[in-house]
Amino acid sequence: MKLTEEEKGIFTYFIPVKGMEEQLCKALTGVSERVEKGSETCGGNLIIQGGQGCGKTMLSTSIIKVLQQKTGKVDGRVGKIDATILNKKDIASMFSKIEGGCLIIERAGELTKNAAVTLSLLLEKDKKGTFLILEDSPKGIKKVLSKDENFAKKFTETVDVPIFTNDELISFARSYSRELGYKIDDMAVLALYNRISKIQRLNQATTLTEVKEIVDEAIDREAHGGLRKAISILTAKRYTDDDRIVLTEKDFE
């Protein structure tokens, strides 16, 4: 199975990651069945697991967008909530507000047993294709699935967001800057590799969030470049042929 070109565009940040397209195809197939059949299928809810800052919520929202296009469903509200807050809510009342839509539960490992049981029962009664996405680290996901067996059975689809290689982080940075109307030139890419190497730690992977912050900082520097910016405007080097603003090596130093 492969994603369409349009779907690849929606998942542009993640497609360069080895094995991600296959994971997404499998997950979309299972979740589509849940969305279309509702309580007629016991599974089809989704787990997205990975480290902090790896883009889990970004991936969740992209999956929802693709599902809306593929199925014409997910026409209810889409909500996002931290598990510790959800534990204190009237879960049945909240569920009724997102019927036919989706609820993204962040830090899902913090769900209480009572919350897990309640959500499981609500999913069993649901007729409108409401589905849930659990987000957490692998440890947090293991923790929440141990709370209630019936709840765990509802989550048959999983996407693992792996540790990004430096090349994949650079690919993300390029895609992110492109969406904002910028282009990272070749010398700037080398400077970005250098910035990434400086923040890498032995016991913790560099995250998409950290790389996003580096690009945001470069964009801010470009926008307030003073004399250098004035010269680049005069020499017409500030824009690409498709009118994107060029980020240079200096912007990343």
Question: Residue spans of the language-model regions?
Answer:
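Pre-Walker A (pre-P-loop) alpha-helix and adjacent loop at the N terminus of AAA/AAA+ ATPase modules
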Residues: 3-44
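An amphipathic alpha-helix signature
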Residues: 25, 166-174, 189-193
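Walker A/P-loop
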Residues: 43-76, 155
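AAA+/P-loop NTPase substrate/partner-engagement loops
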Residues: 66-98
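Conserved alpha-helical scaffold flanking the Walker A/P-loop in AAA+ ATPase domains
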Residues: 86-125
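Conserved catalytic/switch belt of AAA+ P-loop NTPases
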Residues: 111-152
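A short helix-turn-beta junction within AAA+ P-loop NTPase domains corresponding to the substrate/partner-engaging
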Residues: 146-164
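C-terminal alpha-helical "lid" subdomain
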Residues: 176-183, 190-253
